Structure formats: structure tokens, C-alpha cells
């Protein structure tokens, strides 16, 4: 016996299926479903009169001991990831994703990958989008409240440095020395997100660098405010090669110790993460952008210049002055700030992101960037580039999957690969920590509906606690049980160096969180950056600052209007 229904009826019950497209927020981007894991007519849905009931889609015999019985199922979700746009159920067990497929009761249903039992809870995601928790790899740890703001935007991992509101932290993403690193590892016990800290990379004595790696730093930051000399950079890379950690570089804006070519000569063929590669955030003026052409450079850019708008240049001078402890009464300080703000390279930045030449996007939080806007600004850039450059190869009307996969990789899998944590986070794949963000498509990229952290709901839009229903106004983000008691430590990870992990840093500091080592970093190249591995020839005109890709000038127009803006923030 069969039953037929219209496409609209099916979508209203179970969400979109193969060939259907979903508009992302109010952007011009459409995600088209490539595959649906459901068996039509046997979809598992929860609620009164629905199929997830005892003896139906819920198996009455199984116990949690069965490896295929889920603790949590996210049902009928549209998964948008760097490698897929699919409709599926997600099975979560012990805080980790264990399957992506079809959930239900194998006794009466076909092709069941995930068993729903009496020990299984359900998050109904029909008509909703699911993405991996975002990863921000350029965080100045200035204010603990950054974690909550980021979490409510869909970011679940922070990497960077700092010790609070010190001048060093405001400027340089550095947690310097074993004492500070240990204190920040202890402070992370109270944060609702995954974290990893970078130490200070300036020292000619390798012991001063090694002791920071041994203390738990996941890498070193070489920053011009501490002196980004070729010598300091080379010594830091030597230590990184020995201990399999990453080097993040904020290069020498003033070209005091050498030019871009001197920096690259010091780097040789060794891998590093180049921060804000366009240069407005800092780095060799005016041609740091050329470093993105090198196969050993993993380039990111930060959100204050993304996307390029008619306000971008004007707001940056004051931001540079404050962030880098400059004095407006000193002409040299003004000149330093001016040298970093070039509308020509800023206008090229969006295009390089769209071409996959720049591989990542991060915040530069409270040091010119906005910690809660990484995801929003990423999709604004994607919208603007489709508007100006048209569809990417392989995309067509109501199908922007190639562009969508490129852009989501910039704040999920590529940052995870770059910093050696892709075994744990960065995508919706079996074996990874269940850091998952649920979106209503209308609010995609702006305001998540809820955030699952380590398999438990961590933050969600919810109503007044005294309301008769969960949607009683005011509806706002509220802490969920993932942020209370022992769950604060049992659902999040702290990343450390392999040597610190092997030497028992968790026991030495009595850390309760899941402590995991970074790994597989030093053999990386840009070819490992998913959907963002282009290495064209880049040139910058030293007089006009115009940017050329393989001899062709690239630029973009300053936006005067953007999606994902005012209509979402009226209240």
C-alpha cells in the first residue's frame, strides 16, 4: 500500500528533500539537497501522533549497551558541511557523533543506521539546518564574556592568546610563559567552549619557547608588537617543527627588520598560519597579501574588513590606534596606523576569499574584530561575491553548493586542520565531538536556534522560565544545562601540545575538562585546506596598492547595503 502527497505537504512534515533548495537567511545563496538518507514513508518524527513511539520508530527491546542506540538523535536535519549538503538524521552517543544516516527501529523499518530506543532523546530538525560548531582561531582572550557571545553566534571553539585586559593581550593574542598558560588553562574550566592557547614566540633562546610548549601552549604567536623579526620567526619555527605545533604570524607592518621577502626567506618551506593576510590587521605594508600564493602558508583574514563596505576604511584608523597602544599626538604612530589601511587591498580581500586563495576567516576579537560576527560576516562576503562575480563553476540557479561549501570550510574544518584539532572538531562526521549548531533557515548565519556542545544542549533561544510554554516572551538566548555543574567540563575540550598532554598537564593542574593534544601540523600545506587551496601568482603595485592575480587586477565595490543586518537586530 502506498500513499502520495504533494511536495509542499512532504516538506511541511519532514523538511526538504533531494533537489529542494533552501535560501540562507536573506542572502542570495541557495543550498540544494544532494542526498536524503530517509526511506520515504518511514521517516522518524517526534510528537503527538508521530512515528517515534514505543513499538513504532522507537525500538522497545534495545538498551543503551547496543552501540547503535543513540543518546540523542537530531532528526531530519539539513546538514551543511564542507563536503556535503544532505538531509539526514544525526546519531549522538557519549557526546560524540557516531552516525549520519537514517534513524528508527530496525525491527520494522528499512535501512536503519541509528537505533532509537527508550534511552534516546530527540531534537526535531525538520525544516532546520545543522552545521558544525564554528572555530575562531584569532581570539584575544581579553574578556571571559567573549565565550558566551561567540557561542550564541554558533562558534564553539576559541584559539588564541591573552590573560585578560592587559596591553599585551589587547594587542597580541599571546599567553606568555608557563605561569600565565597554566592560569588560563585553569580559567578555561569555567568556559562553555573548547579552547587552545598560543604562547609568545619571541625568543632567541629556544628554552624560553620550549617551556611554553611544555606548559600546554598549542603553538606560538609571533607578533610585531613584540618584534616580528626574521630571527624570532625562524627560532619559533624551529621549535614548532620539533614539537609539532603551529606558528601564527602577525608580520612586521613597518618593515623594520625586513620586507615580506625577508620574512618568507626566514620561513623557508615551513608551514605557518598567516594572520589577517590582507594586512589591515597588521603585517608587511603594502604587500603581505602576496604570501597567500605560497604553498606552505595557511592564510586567514579577520572580520573587521569583511565584507568591504563604504564604512570600512573610515572606522579602521581609530581601531588600530586603540588596539596597538598608539598615541594620536605622535606623528609616527599616526603614520603606522595609516600604513595598514589600504582600500585597494581591502577591496581585493573579498575576491581572494571567494577564489579560495584565502583559506580561513576569524575574528581578531576586541583587537579590531568582533567575536560574535565571524559567521555572519562570512556569509555576507559570500552573498556580495555572488552578487558581483556571479555563480562559481558548477553552481547554477538555486544551487550555490560549491560556494557554500567553500565558505563554511573557512570557519570550521580549515581552522581545525590548521591547528591540529580536526580529529576532534570542525565537521559533522562520525567520531567527532558533537558540537552542532541548529538554525532556522530564516535566521541562518545570524542567530542560531540552539547549540549542542559535546552532545548536550548548551545554549538555546527560549522563553520566560515562568511561562506556560517554552515560547513565552521574551524569547532570548539562555544558558542550558550544558553550562551547569559538571557538564561545563564534561562537554568541552581543552587543547594542549602533545608534550604537555603526554606529561600529564591535566593531572598536574587538576583539570576536569577533556584535554586533547594537537597533532599532524608540521606536514601540512595549503593543499590540505578544503575548498580553499588556490595558489595563484599574486602581485601588489607598490604605488597604487592594486592587487593582481595571475596578472589580472582584482577588486570589489564597497557595499552600501548587506543582508543579515538591520532586519535581524531590531530587538
UniProtKB/Swiss-Prot annotation:
UniProt lineage: Bacteria, Bacillati, Bacillota, Bacilli, Bacillales
Residues annotated with N6-carboxylysine modification: 221
GO cellular component terms, A-Z: cytoplasm
Protein name: Urease subunit alpha
Domain Urease, residue spans: 133-571
Keywords from the named record: Cytoplasm, Hydrolase, Metal-binding, Nickel
Binding-site residues, Ni(2+) 1: 138, 140, 221, 364
Record text on subunit structure and interactions: Heterotrimer of UreA (gamma), UreB (beta) and UreC (alpha) subunits. Three heterotrimers associate to form the active enzyme.
PROSITE patterns reported for this sequence: UREASE_1 (PS01120), UREASE_2 (PS00145), UREASE_3 (PS51368)
GO biological process: urea catabolic process
Disulfide links within the chain: none
PANTHER family: UREASE
InterPro entries xref list: Amidohydro-rel, Metal-dep_hydrolase_composite, Metal_Hydrolase, Urease_alpha_N_dom, Urease_alpha_subunit, Urease_AS, Urease_asu, Urease_asu_c
Pathway(s) annotated for this protein in UniProt: Nitrogen metabolism; urea degradation; CO(2) and NH(3) from urea (urease route): step 1/1
GO terms of molecular function: nickel cation binding; urease activity
Family: Belongs to the metallo-dependent hydrolases superfamily. Urease alpha subunit family.
Key word Transmembrane present: no
Keyword Chloroplast in record: no
Residues bound to substrate: 223
Active site location: 324
Pfam families noted in UniProt: Amidohydro_1, Urease_alpha
Cofactor note: Binds 2 nickel ions per subunit.
Cofactor or coenzyme needed: Ni cation
EC code: 3.5.1.5
Organism, as annotated: Staphylococcus aureus (strain MRSA252)
Principal EC category: hydrolase
Domain of life: Bacteria
Amino acid at each position: 500500500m502506498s500513499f502520495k502527497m504533494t511536495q509542499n505537504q512532504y516538506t511541511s512534515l519532514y523538511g526538504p528533500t533531494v533537489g529542494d533548495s533552501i535560501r540562507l537567511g536573506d542572502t542570495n545563496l541557495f543550498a540544494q539537497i544532494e542526498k536524503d538518507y530517509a526511506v520515504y514513508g518511514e521517516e522518524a518524527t517526534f510528537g503527538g501522533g508521530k512515528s517515534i513511539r514505543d513499538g513504532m520508530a522507537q525500538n522497545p527491546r534495545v538498551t543503551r549497551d547496543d552501540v547503535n542506540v543513540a543518546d540523542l538523535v537530531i532528526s531530519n536535519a539539513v546538514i551543511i558541511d564542507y563536503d556535503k549538503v544532505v538531509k539526514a538524521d544525526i546519531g549522538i552517543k557519549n557526546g560524540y557523533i557516531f552516525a549520519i544516516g537514517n534513524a528508527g527501529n530496525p525491527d520494522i523499518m528499512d535501512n536503519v543506521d541509528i537505533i532509537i530506543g527508550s534511552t534516546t532523546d530527540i531534537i526535531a530538525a525538520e525544516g532546520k539546518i545543522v552545521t558544525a560548531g564554528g572555530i575562531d582561531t584569532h581570539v584575544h582572550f581579553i574578556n571571559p564574556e567573549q565565550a558566551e557571545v561567540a557561542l550564541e553566534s554558533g562558534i564553539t571553539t576559541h584559539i588564541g592568546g591573552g590573560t585578560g585586559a592587559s596591553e599585551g593581550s589587547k594587542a597580541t593574542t599571546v599567553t606568555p610563559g608557563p605561569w600565565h598558560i597554566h592560569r588560563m588553562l585553569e580559567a578555561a574550566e569555567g568556559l562553555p567552549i573548547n579552547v587552545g592557547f598560543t604562547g609568545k614566540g619571541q625568543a632567541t633562546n629556544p628554552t624560553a619557547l620550549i617551556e611554553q610548549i611544555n606548559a600546554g601552549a598549542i603553538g606560538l604567536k609571533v607578533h610585531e608588537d613584540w618584534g616580528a623579526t626574521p630571527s624570532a620567526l625562524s627560532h619559533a619555527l624551529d621549535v614548532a617543527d620539533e614539537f609539532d605545533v603551529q606558528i601564527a604570524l602577525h608580520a612586521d607592518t613597518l618593515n623594520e627588520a625586513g620586507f615580506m621577502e625577508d620574512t618568507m626567506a626566514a620561513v623557508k618551506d615551513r608551514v605557518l598560519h598567516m594572520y589577517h593576510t590582507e594586512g589591515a590587521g597588521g603585517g608587511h605594508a603594502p604587500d603581505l597579501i602576496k604570501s597567500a600564493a605560497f604553498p606552505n602558508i595557511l592564510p586567514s583574514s579577520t572580520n573587521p574588513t569583511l565584507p568591504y563596505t563604504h564604512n570600512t576604511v573610515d572606522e579602521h584608523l581609530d581601531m588600530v590606534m586603540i588596539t596597538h597602544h598608539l598615541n594620536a599626538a605622535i606623528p609616527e604612530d599616526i603614520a603606522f596606523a595609516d600604513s595598514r589601511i589600504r582600500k585597494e587591498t581591502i577591496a581585493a580581500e573579498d575576491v581572494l576569499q571567494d577564489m579560495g586563495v584565502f583559506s580561513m576567516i576569524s575574528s581578531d576579537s576586541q583587537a579590531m574584530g568582533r567575536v560574535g560576527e565571524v559567521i555572519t560576516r562570512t556569509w555576507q562576503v559570500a552573498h556580495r561575491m555572488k552578487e558581483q562575480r556571479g555563480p562559481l563553476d558548477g553552481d547554477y540557479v538555486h544551487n550555490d553548493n560549491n560556494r557554500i561549501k567553500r565558505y563554511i570550510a573557512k570557519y570550521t574544518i580549515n581552522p581545525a586542520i590548521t591547528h591540529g584539532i580536526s580529529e576532534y572538531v570542525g565537521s559533522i562526521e562520525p567520531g567527532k565531538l558533537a558540537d552542532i549548531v541548529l538554525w532556522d533557515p530564516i535566521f541562518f548565519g545570524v542567530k542560531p536556534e540552539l547549540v549542542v556542545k559535546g552532545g548536550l544542549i548548551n545554549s538555546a533561544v527560549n522563553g520566560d522560565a515562568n511561562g506556560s510554554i517554552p515560547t513565552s516572551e521574551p524569547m532570548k538566548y539562555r544558558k542550558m544545562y550544558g553550562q551547569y555543574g559538571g557538564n561545563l567540563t564534561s562537554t568541552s575540550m581543552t587543547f594542549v601540545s602533545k608534550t604537555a598532554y603526554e606529561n600529564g598537564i591535566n593531572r598536574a593542574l587538576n583539570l576536569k575538562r577533556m584535554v586533547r593534544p594537537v597533532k599532524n601540523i608540521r606536514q601540512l600545506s595549503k593543499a590540505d585546506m578544503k575548498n580553499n587551496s588556490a595558489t595563484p601568482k599574486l602581485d601588489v603595485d607598490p604605488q597604487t596598492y592594486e592587487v593582481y592575480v595571475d596578472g589580472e587586477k582584482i577588486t570589489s565595490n564597497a557595499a552600501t547595503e548587506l543582508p543579515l543586518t538591520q532586519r535581524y537586530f531590531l530587538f
